[in-house]
Amino acid sequence: MIHKNNYQQLRIGLASPEQIRAWAERILPTGEIVGKVTQPYTLHYKTHKPERDGLFCERIFGPIKSGFCACGNYQAVDNGKEFSSFCKQCGVEFTESRVRRYQMGYIELACPVTHVWYLKRLPSYIANLLAKPLNDLESLVYCDITYPNLYLARPIAEKPTLLQLKGFFKYEDQSWRYLFPRFFSTRGFEAFKSREIATGGDAVRKELASLNLKTVMECTYLEWKDLAKQKPTGNEWEDRGIQRIKDFMVRRIRLVKHFLYTDVKPEWMVLSLLPVLPPELRPMIEVSGGLLLTSDLNELYRKVIYRNNTLIDFLLRSEFTPEGLIVCQKRLVQEAVDALIDNGIRGQPIRDSHNRPYKSFSDIIEGKEGRFRENLLGKRVDYSGRSVIVVGPSLPLHRCGLPREMAIELFQAFVIRGLIGRYLAQNLRDAKNMIQNKEPIIWKILRDVMQGHPVLLNRAPTLHRLGIQAFQPILIEGRAIRLHPLVCGGFNADFDGDQMAVHVPLSLEAQAEARFLMLSHTNLLSPATGDPIAVPTQDMLLGLHILTIEDSQGIYGVRYFPYSKRNCTSFFKIPYFNSYDDVLRAKEQRQIHFYSPIWLRWKGFLRVITSINREFPIEIQYESSNISVHIYENYQIRKDKKGNRLSLYIRTTAGRVLFNQQIEEAIQGTLKAF
């Protein structure tokens, strides 16, 4: 529903028959009411003009050419008039042809049909409201082969009845033919049947209309309350059955509350009037050679009208038409409407002559290429761009890299204002020429503009709020957006070709919201569960594992370091280093590699956590200067002759030294920030 004056909103829900009729019906100056589509025809095969009362009728949906009626008469369109003018001969309104994009029609069904979304989709709303098995309802609606003669009896207490029937029952054709005529005349039997007995969608509609939602909610709540008081029986199967019943009651209460809150009646889930979409949304196009290409919806609408008109003829001649034939025709109408709404939901879809399934209304609106995601949510907007994302591990968590070509387009208005404000350009044209020529000064101004201006990155589909996050942009070379890999968890993105959209917040309020609430380093936890979102990826974990890997032989295998030279194996003593810088310098000079075992002098507090607590060292070496070296599994201590500790060396690798240095620098930087 769209309100032009206040604001625009789109609400999807059930529409009443009166609302559907109000969408389509119009009253001509002659008093004739138009809007009902009664013929299955589209265009005349010779003139290619819309057929009267057909799916493209100009009286119902508006003129094909602005100001021209079906007769070919012309009258200037005056949108300022309060009342439109109509052609006296054909009844077509003299108005703009664009009304065919929103003017609707309707088909008056000869029998009520259930809306397949509310019957077959799980959970089935109709089955939940009526508290009946879905299989029984389907057999009632479609007259399935399993229960071909299933009817629903609803005696009305206020009126006299001769049959004490209530609920589902089966009948045979012979019983109707021989039993009831003994008590009723033909007209009396028809009146009795329409009052007491129903089948198909009519039976479901009557059941839904008889529901008192408040009473249903109160009774269901009392039943749930009684079950909740029961203690577990100890039998696993019985307890599961009771839990399923309780879950069903909770779903039923929620559904009834939704109907009461939205002021929607349950019987609206059964259609008596079928809306017909505007012609421009289901076009028929003529190509070269006179060939007509049509939307699948037109063929599905035609099938509905054909079957509905056949049912109308059967009902008009009901005295001579077998009851079973009427029931089968009602089923055909139900199946045609189901195929129009959601083709294939009940099994095999309806196909065309090329064995291709028809594209139904559900197929048009759902999915990535549907009306909502592609046409409504996927529209292009100003100050936005889109590109492939690539990994940028050197970037801070809150920064992203924007290509120069994209950044100059997104921030062009701000750059122009900067050029004119600094008197580097006389007017708008000069500023645009400078940008087009890519003069060096524009990159300096662009960096100044981007310095305090965050951007929003979005990856579709946006399933939660972390699908859109703010970043501080920087200029990079290339044509891809550079992103830190740790922020990919919130976007559910990876670097195998994923694309992301960039949006520039313009107002100060939007920029403040992006800076204080949406920056990526402030969204490290999931808002739903509280679990960390920024977690290391698999390639990070693999890199850390390789960086910190060591020889599994321990102290017994790395006392001496083997290396190969000309197919000969030599042994060098494991080197000693005094600091991180010495280790990294030796790595740069290729004296060692990341996996080389080394002894590193350690000046801090040593806390050793091992699986085996050793009271004595593995080995004690004595030197000539009365210095002893106590060698343990992961460290060694040098002591003087009095037992005082002179130095401490730990066994590690160059890769672990590099990793530990990065961790220490990050922690110290965080402490300085606070």
UniProtKB/Swiss-Prot annotation:
UniProt keywords (A-Z) are:
Chloroplast, DNA-directed RNA polymerase, Magnesium, Metal-binding, Nucleotidyltransferase, Plastid, Transcription, Transferase, Zinc
User: Which family is this sequence assigned to?
Assistant: Belongs to the RNA polymerase beta' chain family. RpoC1 subfamily.
Encoded by which gene?
A: rpoC1
Name of this chain's protein:
DNA-directed RNA polymerase subunit beta'
Q: How is the cofactor bound?
A: Binds 1 Mg(2+) ion per subunit.
Q: Which HAMAP family match?
A: RNApol_bact_RpoC1 (MF_01323)
Q: What is its main location?
A: plastid
Instruction: Write out the GO cellular component annotations.
Output: chloroplast; DNA-directed RNA polymerase complex; mitochondrion
Please provide, alphabetically and separated by semicolons, the GO molecular function terms listed in this UniProt record.
Answer: DNA binding; DNA-directed RNA polymerase activity; magnesium ion binding; zinc ion binding
Pfam family example for this protein?
RNA_pol_Rpb1_3
Its source organism is Psilotum nudum
Q: What does this protein do?
A: DNA-dependent RNA polymerase catalyzes the transcription of DNA into RNA using the four ribonucleoside triphosphates as substrates.
Quaternary context? In plastids the minimal PEP RNA polymerase catalytic core is composed of four subunits: alpha, beta, beta', and beta''. When a (nuclear-encoded) sigma factor is associated with the core the holoenzyme is formed, which can initiate transcription.
Tell me the residue numbers annotated for binding Zn(2+).
C69, C71, C87, C90
